Amino acid sequence: MSQAGAQEAPIKKKRPPVKDEDLKGARGNLTKNQEIKSKTYQVMRECEQAGSAAPSVFSRTRTGTETVFEKPKAGPTKSVFG
C-alpha cells in the first residue's frame, strides 16, 4: 500500500562530458552576426554614443584595454554649472 501524499524521488540524469572541440565551435557561434534586441542594451548603446558612459562589456566597440586605472585625457575640466 502506498500513501496518497508520498512522492517518489526524482531520478537524476548525468550530463555527458563536454569535449574541448565542442566548446571552440560553440563560443564563436554565441553572438555571431546577431543583433541584440534588448531595451537595456539599446539604452546602453545610446549612452555610449552620446559619450555619457564608458564602453560596456557587451559593446563591440570595446577594445579590452579599457581599465579603471587609466588616467583621464588632458582637457578642460567640466563644470556642473554650465
UniProtKB/Swiss-Prot annotation:
GO annotations of cellular component type: cytoplasm; extracellular region; nucleoplasm; nucleus
Recorded superkingdom: Eukaryota
Record keywords: Chondrogenesis, Cytoplasm, Myogenesis, Nucleus, Phosphoprotein, Secreted
InterPro entries for the chain: MUSTN1
GO biological process, one term: positive regulation of gene expression
Pfam family, one: Mustang
Tissue specificity: Expression in skeletal muscle is reduced during limb unloading but increases during the active recovery phase that follows.
Functional description taken from the UniProt entry: Required for chondrocyte development and proliferation. Plays a role in myoblast differentiation and fusion. Modulates skeletal muscle extracellular matrix composition. Plays a role in skeletal muscle function. Plays a role in glucose homeostasis.
Similarity-based family: Belongs to the MUSTN1 family.
Name of the protein: Musculoskeletal embryonic nuclear protein 1
Species whose genome carries this gene: Homo sapiens (Human)
Gene designation per UniProt: MUSTN1
